[in-house]
A protein has these predicted regions:
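Conserved Asp/Asn-Gly motif in the active-site loop of CheY-like receiver
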Residues: 37-44
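N-terminal glycine-/serine-/threonine-rich beta1-alpha1-beta2 phosphate-ribose binding loop
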Residues: 6, 15, 33-36, 55
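Conserved SAM-binding loop
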Residues: 9, 39, 88-89
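CheY-like receiver
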Residues: 48-130
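Conserved binding/recognition cores within well-folded domains
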Residues: 119-161
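Short, well-ordered amphipathic alpha-helices
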Residues: 18-27, 46-47, 74
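Conserved acidic segment of CheY-like receiver
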Residues: 4-24, 59
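A generic structural motif
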Residues: 28-37, 83-84
C-alpha cells in the first residue's frame, strides 16, 4: 500500500509554487509515495483553508508574501498544530533564527538544490512517522483491561468505555 502525504505549498510566486510542486511529485514518485499537493498564494489563504480542514503533513512556506509573512503564519499555525513539518523556502537569510521559534524542520535558501530538498523531505517523513508511533504508543498505553468477576471492561483513563 502506498503511503499518502499531504503537502501545502504557500508562496506568492506562481513559478516557485509550480517548481516546488513538480519537485514534490518527483520525490514522491522516487519513494513510491502518493502526494497530495495544495497550493496557496498567501498566508491568509492558507490559514482560511486550514481552519476548515487541518490535514497537512508538510508545509513548504515562503517568508516574504505580502500582508502576512511566513513566520507570522507559522506562529499562528503552531498555536494548535505541532506535528505539521514546516520547511521555510526563501531567498532571505535574515529570518533563519525566526524558524527556530516555530520549530521549523529546516530553512532552505532559493534557488533550491534538488538533492538537499529531497533530503529535507525525507527528514520530514521520518519525523512524521516517529510522531505517529509516539501517538500510537500513548493511545495504547492509556488503555487498560480490568477483569473483575470474569467481566471485561475497557477503560481509558478514568472513563469506562
Amino acid at each position: 500500500m502506498c503511503q499518502t502525504y499531504r503537502i501545502a505549498i504557500c508562496d506568492d510566486l506562481a513559478t516557485d509554487r509550480n517548481y516546488l510542486s513538480s519537485l514534490c511529485e518527483i520525490w514522491g514518485s522516487h519513494n513510491s509515495y502518493h502526494i497530495q499537493i495544495s497550493e496557496f498564494t498567501s498566508a491568509e489563504n492558507f490559514l482560511f483553508n486550514y481552519a476548515e480542514k487541518k490535514d497537512f503533513d508538510i508545509l513548504l512556506l515562503d517568508i516574504e508574501m505580502g500582508a502576512m509573512d511566513g513566520v507570522t503564519m507559522a506562529r499562528k499555525l503552531r498555536q494548535d498544530n505541532h506535528t505539521v513539518q514546516i520547511i521555510f523556502i526563501t531567498g532571505y537569510a535574515d529570518y533563519i533564527s525566526d524558524g527556530y521559534e516555530v520549530d521549523a524542520l529546516h530553512y532552505l535558501m532559493k534557488p533550491l538544490q534538488e538533492e538537499k530538498f529531497f533530503t529535507v523531505l525525507d527528514r520530514a517523513v521520518t519525523k512524521l512517522i516517529k510522531n505517529e508511533k509516539v501517538l500510537n504508543i500513548i493511545s495504547v498505553s492509556e488503555m487498560r483491561f480490568v477483569c473483575p468477576s470474569a467481566r471485561l471492561r475497557l477503560c481509558r483513563g478514568k472513563q469506562q468505555l
